[in-house]
Amino acid sequence: ANKRPIWIMGHMVNAIYQIDEFVNLGANSIETDVS
């Protein structure tokens, strides 16, 4: 079988406290906006 990874991204995580929120919602990757 050709297995591929599935990414559930937490989009626009802009504060440390949001990481736990997105992970608790099922995210297994985090995307941040840095400026």
Swiss-Prot record:
**InterPro entries assigned:** PLC-like_Pdiesterase_TIM-brl
Cellular component terms per the entry's GO annotation: extracellular region
- Listed EC numbers: 4.6.1.-
What keywords would UniProt list here?
Answer: Cytolysis, Dermonecrotic toxin, Disulfide bond, Hemolysis, Lipid degradation, Lipid metabolism, Lyase, Magnesium, Metal-binding, Secreted, Toxin
Q: Which cofactor does it need?
A: Mg(2+)
Tissues in which the UniProt entry reports expression: Expressed by the venom gland.
> What positions does the entry give for Mg(2+) binding?
31, 33
Q: What class of enzyme is it?
A: lyase
- What detail does the entry give on cofactor binding? Binds 1 Mg(2+) ion per subunit.
Family, similarity comment: Belongs to the arthropod phospholipase D family. Class I subfamily.
> Protein name, please?
Dermonecrotic toxin LdSicTox-alpha-1
- Naturally occurring in which organism (per UniProt): Loxosceles deserta
